[in-house]
């Protein structure tokens, strides 16, 4: 009686159940985020980067370790054991230093998001289109600066990371 069939019946979700409403609301939230992202006037490679970051499919140390790549899990910049996309692009001291230089709402944005996708959702609501475009460019520039630090052993100052993001957005 309490086997697989019982479990399946318990997990079956009716059209009007709270669980299905919650699942549907999450899908709708995702659609709103993606729709806003696809409408931004940013280079396709940056759009692809933010999309991949939001889905947590960037080649972070944590994701590489999940694929059984032997790698030290500590952050290459700060040595923290937190190596998530959210840490890399928002919480790491390098990222925080860059975000502190951005003027306006971005500088004062809350960092209590639990995932990068949650952060994107939050910022999508708070920022204007222009600010959101700048945010994507800065995130992409932080990622590139970290890669330069790791692969080329070249450290880019925070103000240069921000400047390159602003210039790239202006040129686009």
Where are these regions (language model features)?
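A helix-boundary/hinge signal
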Residues: 1-172
